[in-house]
Amino acid sequence: YNPDKFTPAVIEFVDIAGLVKGASKGEGLGNKFLSNIREVDAIVHVVRCFESDDIIHVEGSVDPARDIETINLELIFSDIEMAQRRLDKTAKALKGDKSLQGEVDFLKRLIAHLENGLPARSVEINDETEQNVLDTTALLSAKPVIYACNMSEEDFTSGIESNKNYNA
């Protein structure tokens, strides 16, 4: 295959400050983090998996599973607020436009899904209307995620399987 035009693939990485519990309520750099993350197409979540007395963890101990859950929950909490605002707006508009009933029903189901601690990317989509609502609501937990383990050099020489945090 000889294409007429060659376009190289480009990935731009944006380093966003870490997130802490309560970020969805504005704690730490929460609001700045959440606004920055809205601008990206996907999330690479770098998770600390190494122990070091020189680098203190914000929670006091290294626990990658806890850290992943903290971030996911903060994104979900932010999404619940976004989805609720959209539901309120759409429900008002529904009084004059009954064609919005499908959107209202989906938003209610989406909010219940989020309130169960599940990310928006895992909600069942039944039709184009629901997909459009999901795509246009700017939900953070709908973005694809890659988890990257930040490990010590020693872990790579001795084998990453021996790192208890990696296996978590």
Language-model regions: role of each:
Residues 89-168:
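C-terminal-of-GTPase-core extension/linker across diverse P-loop GTPases
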Residues 12, 41-48, 64-90, 106-118, ...:
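Conserved beta-strand/loop subsegment of P-loop NTPase cores
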Residues 1-45, 50-65, 69, 125-137, ...:
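Switch II of P-loop NTPase G domains
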Residues 22, 55, 74, 86, ...:
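Active-site-proximal flexible loops/turns
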